[in-house]
Amino acid sequence: MSKLKLNDVNIYYGDFHAVQNVNLEVPARSVTAFIGPSGCGKSTVLRSINRMHEVTPGAYVKGEILLDGENIYGSKIDPVAVRNTIGMVFQKANPFPTMSIEDNVVAGLKLSGEKNKKKLKEVAEKSLRGANLWEEVKDRLDKPGGGLSGGQQQRLCIARAIAVEPEILLMDEPCSALDPISTLAVEDLIHELKEEFTIVIVTHNMQQAARVSDQTAFYSLEATGRPGRLVEIGPTKKIFENPDQKETEDYISGRFG
């Protein structure tokens, strides 16, 4: 059974139809990459998976997004609970700059009412180890998170996301602002994280999609102002070497987009 399933998903911002008729499945403990030209809706779909797009006034979804068979848009489902179960790492690292490294990691736990200092310290260490950051920061946990390098800040944000023990981790271009060395560190981390988490990543870097993902979804749009759509999804090797759709092949080979 798929961990995540989108059935006839259409996404709107007020009267604007942003994405149309997306159907896809994401297996548990795998990495799925979303690729496609700017404006095709891949980040919009990503944000709809944990209801983050709803912070935009007038945004809504038609269709179903199923997590372990349950529609996350069901009438009795709490969006905050959805965001705890489905974590998000954004394009720009966004640690709380004046908060200590340790407090950054456990901010979500504290927000949900956890006060046991021993547990908070244990979770902070476990999460920093999980984000391959512990050895670099273990002697300065009380220092501000804003003092870390860009790559370290992004891994700190990943540690913060996994501290609340989500089942799915969404990543919206997590390496776009990073140098090649920091990018490699995050990519290595993604390979390790999929042992425990289901990951969906949006990337403009097709080489990155090829390196880190098990399956790839290609999105496109017919023209500016038209809805984005899912053109094709399949095993990453097949999408990059022998896609079913000419549109996919043209994008990957650099003929458009």
Curated annotation (Swiss-Prot):
Pfam families: ABC_tran (PF00005)
SUPFAM superfamilies (UniProt xref): P-loop containing nucleoside triphosphate hydrolases
GO molecular function, one term: ATP hydrolysis activity
Binding site for ATP: 36-43
Coiled coil stretches, renumbered: none
Highest taxon of source: Bacteria
CDD domains: ABC_PstB_phosphate_transporter (cd03260)
Gene Ontology BP terms: phosphate ion transmembrane transport
TM stretches of this protein: none
Reactions this protein catalyses: phosphate(out) + ATP + H2O = ADP + 2 phosphate(in) + H(+)
Membrane topology classification: Peripheral membrane protein
UniProt entry tagged with the keyword Transferase: no
A Gene Ontology term for the protein's cellular component: plasma membrane
InterPro entries: AAA+_ATPase, ABC_transporter-like_ATP-bd, ABC_transporter-like_CS, P-loop_NTPase, PstB-like
UniProt keyword annotations, A-Z: ATP-binding, Cell membrane, Membrane, Nucleotide-binding, Phosphate transport, Translocase, Transport
Protein name as catalogued: Phosphate import ATP-binding protein PstB
Gene of this entry: pstB
